[in-house]
A protein has these predicted regions:
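Exported/extracytosolic protein signature
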Residues: 1-184
């Protein structure tokens, strides 16, 4: 009686975190032509990998059209939380959303940022044409146009690239002048 050989095969699946970050504009008070308004952006960090990972520092960099002036900024973990959030301070024009948070495999974390904005047609470089969003040669939203805003992730912390890290909303001025003409 001879024993049959047994072949064992082990398959080791590579375990790794896989972080991605994306941004969207969720509320644009400037779309109706208001001079002073709020604009809300949602940032979502997701771990699509099989191991927990830290998001690393996530920052928010608005680059609005000239004349769209930020009066204040608030950061919260929910859109409703923005109403009671304290004012955030920018460092060199960049707001810190988080210094890093641990995300379990398959987990997501939301951050919200709200800017109170005033449209100032007297600002240097103001152009109504720049109040609309536009795209650059890579078909990505262009900075310095409309309510352009970008979330920045640390190197290696955004597996799906930066093209979905940009959001923009237009502002539409509704300034008009009525001239009356009459005869007697």
């Amino acid at each position: 009686n001879e024993a049959a050989p047994i072949t064992c095969t082990f398959v080791n699946e590579y375990q790794a975190p896989k972080l991605r970050v994306e941004k969207s504009i969720e509320a644009n008070g400037g779309a109706n032509g208001a001079t002073s308004f709020n604009v809300d952006y949602k940032i979502v960090a997701t771990n699509d990998g099989s191991l927990a990972a830290n998001t690393g520092k996530l920052t928010d960099k608005p680059d609005f059209a000239k004349g769209l002036e930020i009066q204040s900024a608030k950061i919260a973990e929910t859109q409703a939380g923005l109403d009671s959030a304290s004012n955030a301070t920018a460092t060199n024009g960049v707001y810190t959303l988080t210094d890093g948070v641990e995300l379990a495999a398959g987990a997501s974390k939301e951050y919200w940022i709200r800017f109170a904005v005033t449209r100032n047609p007297a600002a240097a470089g103001y152009s109504e044409a720049d109040l609309a969003c536009s795209v650059n040669g890579n078909n990505e939203k262009a900075p310095g146009k409309g309510l352009f805003n970008e979330v920045l992730a640390e190197n290696g912390k955004d597996s799906d690239g930066t093209s979905n890290n940009k959001a923009c909303g237009p502002t539409v001025p509704h300034d008009f002048v009525v001239i009356k003409a009459g005869t007697q």
